[in-house]
Amino acid sequence: MSSDAPDSFEPGAGIAAEVKNARIEDEMEQSYIDYAMSVIAGRALPDVRDGLKPVHRRILYAMHQAGVTSNSSHRKSSSIVGETMGDYHPHGDSAIYDTLARMAQDFSMRYPLVDGQGNFGSVDGDPPAAMRYTEARMSPIAEELLDDIDKDTVDFQSNYDDRKQEPTVLPSSFPNLLVNGSSGIAVGMSTNIPPHNLGEVVDATVELIENPDATVADLMEHIKGPDFPTGANIVGRNAVHKAYKTGRGRVRVRADYDVFEEEGRIVINELPYQENKARLIERIADDVNEGKIEGIRDIRDESDRDGIRVVIELKRGAMAEVVKNQLLDNHLESTFGVINLALVDGQPQVLTLKETLEHYLDHRRDVVRRRSEYELAEAEDRAHILDGRLKALDNIDDVVETIRNSESRDDAKAALRGEVEVEVDGEPLPTFDFSEEQANHIVSMQLGSLTSMEAAEIEAEYEDVQATIERLETILGDQSELDAVIESELLDIKDEYADDRRTSFVANTGEVTRADLIPEEDVVVVVSEDDYIKRMPVSRFRAQHRGGKGIIGTDLKEGDNVSSVFVTNTHDDLLCFTNHGQVYQLKAYQVPEMSRTARGKSAVNLLDFDDGEEITAVVNCDDLEDIEGYLTMVTRNGYIKRTGTDRFQNILSTGIIATKLDEGDELVDVEVTDGESDLVIGTERGMSIRFDEDEVRAMGRSARGVRGIKLEGDDVVAGVAAIDEAHHSWILTVTENGYGKRTDLDAYRTQSRNGKGLIDIKANERNGPVCAINTVGEGDHLVVMSDEGQILRTPVEDISTVGRNTMGVIVMDLDEGDAVASVDVIPAAMTTEAEELDDADSVEEDAETDAKADADDE
């Protein structure tokens, strides 16, 4: 060890002038936020104004500065990459070259911004040739993005080493964000904007200029939908309208193909956007070899520089339509997930179609205003010079005499400015009051400019400049005139570059699917502890007064008990959360419909469960894409977290993680919340706590969450309820021994999370532990199911309203040894207003009739 080493470490010694102590959690959080915002604003998301990310903008500006324009010769890509990296973008050369190459690909960009020469990749996924072999220059339409950039139209900032200035945004003569689209993944967010037809986008922008109150539907009269560079077909228009109206949507894109029934051949002419042709052919061949697709004997790729042509030869006797449908199910259709996310004033925002165009127009108005101010200043300067020249020509003899008799050039200028007096033979010459700029110009005039013809030209130019000044002042003083300039320039761009649509629309008729054959109806779904699952129509369970035994709802094998029951619609999407913290997705109609006396089907045939995994909570909705807000989850040991619903849009068949769990903990309940709800957590021992949802910050799927309630002893969480005061009036609690109560929401005061809470219901020997806690409103019905498979349906109004810390009333009459297993609410919208309550005897009689009907059905 060196003898120079210090004996002890002193804070700050040899490190910094000041050492600041900080909690590592705070430092990590702030550093991560800084990193995230750097990625969001500096790399991954496009600016709404010019539709470019920084790397695209820097490449184009570097080419502009180097003179690599559309009318210049091509330059080596390595040279362009080097200049971009050296002057503006200090990152890896491969990232810059990949971006440059993509801007040159006509199958990636609807209107390529780079004119490439050489191998820049292919639709088969072939990579571009090395940058030393390829050459590039700006395309003509790319120059429109930089037009007037030298007229103070946009702000500039210092480059990374303060040597040069770079634009923060390009002037952008057309709405490039919509025209060429964009995609990127940032921290916690992503963007995926499809390309569009330039002519349609210009027409929509002009419509918005002329009619600022235009709706999305009005704009869609011009913009029919995405226009992909690879063509293909968009299936239906509803998804497109939703994407334009909300900024998010899923658009189905189908390959364009021809079916030749007599020849036994299917020919694919166009592929969905971003589909890899080589991989598509490989996947089809694999499915044919594995027997998943029948009737195909050969696949040939006959594509050339004129377009795509994939020929699928059918076996003798194979039905072309059947094979086509198999291909559509697996290969010839893809989904383009629209996320119209862009930077607005440096902040990421999801934008509607109208908002996107409005932000572009705001930018363009600013550009045209600044350009007009710049040109006005130049015109006024020129008019000032011309005015001086005209005055000089009117007094040419005196001006020449003054200059000739001045001792120096500076004296001549001073004399023209009227600052000194010039004498000839003792007599003073006339004085002038030219400005410094005029004097400088007059002194520099050549004798040839003193001709009468030159004077006429100066006067004509002066009149033209005055007209220009008047025009520019009109533009700057009248918003409608400024908008007229924008409109005219947009239409010029359209005339120069617009082309026909490549992507067509096909009706969303398609083939008859299983879903088309299943009627929409409200159903009760029952899940057992051994993961047997089935569904039954809600109509099979007639409402009765509380205190009844209900009717048989399912058959159970020995040792099995009911785990959960919930009410949904056959066409709903189901998110099935398990005790292991996983979530799975399926359609409600995928759950087999069976009689009340049937056992059900093993859920492992529907969901890929691990050993010991069982469903503990289900969230259902009309369409998974329509869920907005958060999924709020609670665990058995009192942890709670909420995660944005957008994190659950693409759930694998094997499930995905919904929440991280500590060893020995389990996920017990999940609620959909809107970000402004109050939450009530209930425990098995009858405690409850109400707090604002904002106290639980949004987290990712793999986070554990925070403490929601402080549990005492061996108490555990029974469930969570979200309060929507517009629809909910009471908290309804049910215990395992069949007792329950309704309590007004006001009885549960709001506290801070992680408290012990208040007594909700007495969980004594008579009542037993709490089984479920729900929020209910007028007209709602309750579905209560016991361990042994009995189901009771009763209106919530039939259950007494009492305070907290009370015993409650009998809800379900249980047989000895039986217990309440699960409770769910039938919303008032699902109940029939004219429905009459049955007493227990009539329910038993109906049960016998239903059982006979079920037996006949089976």
From Swiss-Prot:
Catalysis: reaction(s): ATP-dependent breakage, passage and rejoining of double-stranded DNA
Motif GyrA-box location, chain numbering: 544-550
Gene responsible for this protein: gyrA
One annotated GO molecular function: ATP binding
Main location: cytoplasm
EC number annotated for this UniProt entry: 5.6.2.2
Basic and acidic residues bias (residue ranges): 849-858
InterPro entries: GyrA, GyrA/parC_rep, Gyrase/topoIV_suA_C, Topo_IIA-like_dom_sf, Topo_IIA_A/C_ab, Topo_IIA_A_a_sf, Topo_IIA_dom_A, Type_II_DNA_Topoisomerases
Species annotation: Haloferax lucentense (strain DSM 14919 / JCM 9276 / NCIMB 13854 / Aa 2.2)
Pfam families documented for this protein: DNA_gyraseA_C (PF03989), DNA_topoisoIV (PF00521)
Domain Topo IIA-type catalytic: 45-517
UniProt keyword annotations, A-Z: ATP-binding, Cytoplasm, DNA-binding, Isomerase, Nucleotide-binding, Topoisomerase
Function according to Swiss-Prot or TrEMBL: A type II topoisomerase that negatively supercoils closed circular double-stranded (ds) DNA in an ATP-dependent manner to modulate DNA topology and maintain chromosomes in an underwound state. Negative supercoiling favors strand separation, and DNA replication, transcription, recombination and repair, all of which involve strand separation. Also able to catalyze the interconversion of other topological isomers of dsDNA rings, including catenanes and knotted rings. Type II topoisomerases break and join 2 DNA strands simultaneously in an ATP-dependent manner.
Tagged with keyword ATP-binding: yes
Keyword tRNA processing: no
Protein name per Swiss-Prot or TrEMBL: DNA gyrase subunit A
GO cellular component annotations of the record: chromosome; cytoplasm; DNA topoisomerase type II (double strand cut, ATP-hydrolyzing) complex
Active site positions, chain numbering: 133
